[in-house]
Amino acid sequence: MSTLASTRPPPLKLTIPSLEEAEDHAQERRAGGGGQEVGKMHPDCLPLPLVQPGNSPQVREEEEDEQTECEEQLNIEDEEVEEEHDLDLEDPASCCSENSVLSVGQEQSEAAQAALSAQAQARQRLLISQIYRPSAFSSTATTVLPPSEGPPFSPEDLLQLPPSTGTFQEEFLRKSQLYAEELMKQQMHLMAAARVNALTAAAAGKQLQMAMAAAAVATVPSGQDALAQLTATALGLGPGGAVHPHQQLLLQRDQVHHHHHMQNHLNNNENLHERALKFSIDNILKADFGSRLPKIGALSGNIGGGSVSGSSTGSSKNSGNTNGNRSPLKAPKKSGKPLNLAQSNAAANSSLSFSSSLANICSNSNDSNSTATSSSTTNTSGAPVDLVKSPPPAAGAGATGASGKSGEDSGTPIVWPAWVYCTRYSDRPSSGRSPRARKPKKPATSSSAAGGGGGGVEKGEAADGGGVPEDKRPRTAFSGTQLARLKHEFNENRYLTEKRRQQLSGELGLNEAQIKIWFQNKRAKLKKSSGTKNPLALQLMAQGLYNHSTIPLTREEEELQELQEAASAAAAKEPC
């Protein structure tokens, strides 16, 4: 400062201001220049909102740079103010020597310097408070402290600065990122829902169009309704007059066509299932199935001069006409009435009569056991043989077949014959030969019956030699549902209780004996195929309580068994 004072020109007439005037002058400058500086520095020194997270080192470096710039500007301003005041105070003191200890205005200059330093500190605190004033982005609440009786500004106030805005910025950025993620998720859900709605709307639109088309077809008035109305009006106008034959024919034809269309519509699902079958049985179940072979036989028979009469009177006249040969084959189609096998004579051609009777059985049979066959090789009387109930020999040709009454009950459901459920090809009519059938037993002669030895008696007849053939049960034909149920029950338990057997007989419509025999046969087949013996049987065999057929008997046991058989045979002959 002394060098500045020495280089100046000689001072003019100056007056030394008092302490109060110096304070007033400093306050005016602080209010004028300092306020402008604060106004100028405030927008520049405020921290700007950052895009990057607050914890990054770049944000911290920028904040430190801004703070250092603000502090440097404040220091420069303070130095300028101090230099101005020093110049004002040194002007009157320049008259005195620099080496003198006691000068004229030295006491006042120390007091002025103390006051100026206090004012500079106050101004610095004001600037700092303006710079660190909480902004709108800050999440900290500002608390207004009551004015204290002490000094307006103290060094402790400088230490209590507001917290940094970095935490608020971090929280704001984190929440904004979460909000953006939620928005993206909602948009993705909305897009997926829109796609699903579009697909379902398209499918529903197609179904609606199909339903509308079906309803339109159903609501369209058909020609049959119009014809029916016209016929009704015609009949109402002229009740005594007869309908024209041409109109009646048209009406009948339309009715038949409409009925056929409705039948096809109702059986749509069944037709679909039948198409899916690899081998269909529709042709087998038709009445004229296998008719080609009899036609060939009929042609060969016509060459030989033989023919079969198709009349219902039972006459055995030979017409020699091919139409007479084919009429029994077409009878089930046209009339729907079954052929009476008792009145038909199969004298010349056995294959033709067999095919016609079999076709009748297939089309009109109501009982699976009514399998009647006629064969000229086994039956000389020409009457059909009923395998269900064999007639006595005295009845002769007067016995009627079971198939004669089969077509009468049209309301009952059709039950197919047993050969339909058989899997062997030889049992089907397409094999060219008759299904397996028991040959009728020949009546036993009196001599063979009186002989007592039973040499002339057939194997199947009764042991008492009464001459009546044994009534054997035909082979049981189970339906598909019955077999499936029986197999399911067998898999559940191989042995049935009496209560369970009764329940099954009621549910399946079978006899208890049939169910019992089926289970026995199933167990025997399983045992034979597996080759292993029942552990219970093995245990009983080891204890000697179970005599299996495979165990050889001793000589004494064989003799005892023969004695028992002889005693039983003698007891059976005594009542006769």
Swiss-Prot record:
GO terms for biological process: compartment pattern specification; imaginal disc-derived wing vein specification; neuroblast fate determination; regulation of transcription by RNA polymerase II; wing disc anterior/posterior pattern formation. GO terms for cellular component: nucleus. One of its GO terms (molecular function) is RNA polymerase II cis-regulatory region sequence-specific DNA binding. Keywords: Developmental protein, DNA-binding, Homeobox, Nucleus, Transcription, Transcription regulation. Residues 450-468 have a biased composition (Gly residues). Residues 471-530 bind DNA. Pfam families: Engrail_1_C_sig (PF10525), Homeodomain (PF00046). Residues 1-68, 80-102, 305-344, 364-410, 426-476 are annotated as: Disordered. InterPro entries: Engrailed_Homeobox_TFs, HD, HD_engrailed, HD_metazoa, Homeobox-engrailed_C-terminal, Homeobox-engrailed_CS, Homeobox_CS, Homeodomain-like_sf. Residues 309-325, 364-381, 395-405 have a biased composition (Low complexity). Expressed in row 6/7 of the embryonic neuroectoderm. The keyword Secreted does not apply. It is found in: Nucleus. Disulfide bonds: none annotated. The keyword Transcription regulation applies. Residues 80-91 have a biased composition (Acidic residues). Belongs to the engrailed homeobox family. Engrailed (en) and invected (inv) are functionally redundant transcription factors in neuronal precursor cell NB5-3 specification. Inv is unable to substitute for en in other regulatory processes such as maintaining gsb expression in the neuroectoderm after stage 10 of embryogenesis. Maintenance of gsb expression in row 5 of the neuroectoderm involves an as yet unidentified short range signaling molecule. This is Homeobox protein invected.
